[in-house]
Amino acid sequence: MNKILLYCRQGFEKECAAEITAKAAEREIFGFARVKDDSAYVLFECYQQGEAEKLLAELPFSELIFSRQMIVVGELLRDLPPTNRITPVVGMLTGVVEKGGDLRVEVPDTNASKELLKFCRKFTVPLRASLRKDGILLNFESAKRPVVHVFFIASGCCYVGYSLPANNSPLFMGIPRLKFPSDAPSRSTLKLEEAFHVFIPADEWDERLASGMWAVDLGACPGGWTYQLVQRSMMVNAVDNGPMAPSLMDTGQVFHQREDGFKYRPTRNNNYWVVCDMVEKPVRVANLMADWLVNGWCREAIFNLKLPMKKRYEEVAQNLAMIHEKLAQNGINAQIQARQLYHDREEVTVHIRRVWSATPGRRDER
């Protein structure tokens, strides 16, 4: 198996391909990306045998912005016989995976694949039984063992491979299943909820998303992101010239500041969070967020960068590099992560956390 298969958002295949090519080259692993427009996946084929497995192990999945899942696969299985699709799949995995912890039979995230997904659900049960019989899967699910993936791109055609449990998305198809709250002011609320799940470990929520914290939402109207902060029992300064949802104002936790988010200067010195989802050029938002960190106006930030029509990966990379340089020049140590979330559109979401620079692992007390 000498290929890396990456799931991505439909329409962002070129960005996904550019990113994996660059990340592989940084590790002196070379190959070429096979890209089909609007397919919702990318195949990166390594020139040397064994390098796909090496890349899967060495490239942190958390570093990838445009990928929803990363697995190593072999050649495409074509024209699987309708009466016996299982045998070729088992044959592809024999000697490659032993005692896998889970099985996911998946498809690209496109409208055309929805019908195929129904077949995948039915196919999973007999395939799992066969893989367990042959020792490719354990007789029980284990989060500590490799995940077996069967990725159907068409009826009778699939890629077969595996991902590593500590370096993959734990989600089926890499997609979170979040329910839109009926009382939220806008669907954008799901972006911030997903960002919390992606960027903040679940066992740190009570500390880093704690009740009673102060937060600032720049460009808050009508309050989709403010809603998530209120749900975590935070106090929020919502900055926007537009109106906020009355339901949020009635909580007593929201203070509406009718100002331009770029001109607003906080009056409190204990804001833990700043969040921002403004429709603006990405370089302006990136600079603004870097300034908030440099000035010590917050400890963590989550914000969206709206992407141009062309050279989207390059745009994101340049803005992240600028933020990193600006923070470094001011002696600020920070963790920076970015991801095109499932609920994002033509944008990526960035998370920055100040960390204590004097002692590794110590929290930033400013």
From Swiss-Prot:
Its main location: cytoplasm. It comes from the Bacteria. It is an enzyme of class 2 (transferase). Pfam families: FtsJ, RlmM_FDX, RLMM_N. Transmembrane segments: none annotated. The keyword S-adenosyl-L-methionine applies. S-adenosyl-L-methionine binds at residues 188, 221-224, 240, 260, 277. GO terms for cellular component: cytoplasm. GO terms for molecular function: S-adenosylmethionine-dependent methyltransferase activity. InterPro entries: RlmM_FDX (IPR040739), RlmM_THUMP-like (IPR048646), RNA_MeTrfase_FtsJ_dom (IPR002877), rRNA_MeTrfase_M (IPR011224), SAM-dependent_MTases_sf (IPR029063). GO terms for biological process: methylation; rRNA processing. The keyword Transcription does not apply. PANTHER family: RIBOSOMAL RNA LARGE SUBUNIT METHYLTRANSFERASE M (PTHR37524), RIBOSOMAL RNA METHYLTRANSFERASE FTSJ DOMAIN-CONTAINING PROTEIN (PTHR37524:SF2). Belongs to the class I-like SAM-binding methyltransferase superfamily. RNA methyltransferase RlmE family. RlmM subfamily. This is Ribosomal RNA large subunit methyltransferase M. It comes from Erwinia tasmaniensis (strain DSM 17950 / CFBP 7177 / CIP 109463 / NCPPB 4357 / Et1/99). The gene is rlmM.
